[in-house]
Amino acid sequence: MSLFSKIIKGELPSYKIFEDELTFSFLALDQVNLGHTLVIPKTETNHWLDVGQKEYMQVHLNSQKIGKAIMKAVNCPRVGQIVAGFEVPYYHLHLIPAWSIPDLSFTRAKRRSEQEMKEIQKKIISFL
């Protein structure tokens, strides 16, 4: 069972943003920019090319809704979407608040305090 499957099942803690029948979203542990959120299907799938159509569509529909909430929560002009899949072998869509192209670089990723994470979690959820 993957790290993300354990998060979905509640076996590992997370800062949950949104959940429905097919998807789960939570703050990335290492934040590229504050508000960086992952949207994943509940079905464990290694690569985005292999995910079912329903799950793929739901990930993207929810990412649009969550992306709008992130924009309001952090007052950014864009939310970038990135699918990389190198660190965790599970299809996941990164939603990263951005003010410019360099703002999307994973070299910027860092751990935030529990207080910062709880505050941005609450703020994003308030705009859903």
Per-region residue spans from a language model:
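HIT superfamily nucleotide-processing domains
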Residues: 1-128
